[in-house]
Design a protein with these regions (language model features):
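Residue-level signature of outer-membrane beta-barrel architecture
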Residues: 81, 146-148, 199-201, 240-242
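Membrane-embedded beta-strand positions of outer-membrane beta-barrel proteins
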Residues: 54-58, 96-102, 157-163, 195-197, ...
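Outer-membrane beta-barrel "beta-signal"
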Residues: 230-244
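Cleavable N-terminal export/targeting peptides
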Residues: 1-46
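Short loop/turn motifs that connect adjacent beta-strands in outer-membrane beta-barrel proteins
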Residues: 42-51, 84-96, 149-156, 203-209
Length: 244
């Protein structure tokens, strides 16, 4: 396992523990303070009101494994709303939330186009491979999120599972180049199933900064003649949320 892959796995594990650490860090302080009005407890305020939430975010990501030389930069707007009251299930108590996002900024930075030598039937041959910067946009219409019940007045941890669609102006990911209009290559349409964890940190009433880490898979589901995909990438997300 390369040092880069180990670093990405460390970041993912650290982010997964962050919500628990944050909630624990504030639990003692919260326990010492009498029940507060919603105005001074931003987390309880939006939880009880089941408030709509919306805001901008930006993602920076890195491919894993055989895609470790892929980098990603995405940006967009997210909209969501809790659909249930608090559901009690021990340490898993929390609220179910449904949301979606759109990313008009979708960039993938891959190695430059080059020629690659293949061995087939004992014979070596060379073919051109695409590459460079890929531009597109993405829509994630399904985000299922679980907001954990917390006593903290500032931290709201969560985990989520989601599914989206990606369109790129050129077939992605790069593969063996074929003449335009002929069969072969990958697809301009890809799917992006994903899952991750994160936390809202409330700066004040109805305003939070957000940090999340997602593991994202990108695949065309064989819409193209070839489907090498991006089996795994780690995406770090930073955002700002307004609650209404």
């Amino acid at each position: 396992m390369s040092s880069r892959t180990k670093f990405l796995l460390f970041v993912l594990m650290a982010a997964a523990l962050l919500p628990c650490i944050a909630a624990t860090a504030e639990s003692e302080d919260s326990a010492a303070v009498p029940a507060s009005p919603a105005a001074v407890n931003p987390v309880a305020e939006v939880r009880n009101a089941r408030s709509w939430e919306y805001g901008p975010f930006v993602n920076w990501g890195k491919g894993v494994g055989d895609r470790s030389d892929f980098d990603f930069l995405w940006g967009g707007i997210q909209l969501a709303k809790p659909l249930t009251p608090v559901l009690h299930a021990g340490i898993f108590s929390g609220q179910f939330e449904y949301g979606g996002n759109i990313m008009p900024l979708w960039l993938a930075f891959t190695p430059a186009a080059h020629e690659q030598t293949f061995l087939y039937g004992g014979t070596a041959y060379t073919q051109p491979i695409g590459g460079g910067t890929y531009v597109g946009l993405s829509l994630t219409p399904v985000i299922f999120r679980w907001n954990f019940l917390t006593q903290s007045r500032h931290f709201q941890p969560w985990f989520q599972a989601a599914g989206g669609l990606v369109y790129t102006t050129h077939k992605f990911p790069p593969d063996v180049l074929v003449p335009h209009g002929t069969d072969g290559g990958t697809s301009v349409w890809n799917f992006s199933p994903q899952g991750g964890v994160g936390v809202h940190y409330f700066l004040r009433s109805r305003r939070s900064i957000d940090l999340g880490v997602n593991a994202v898979h990108i695949s065309s589901a064989s819409l193209g003649d070839r489907n090498p995909g991006v089996n795994a990438s780690v995406q770090i997300q930073v955002g700002y949320t307004f609650w209404k």
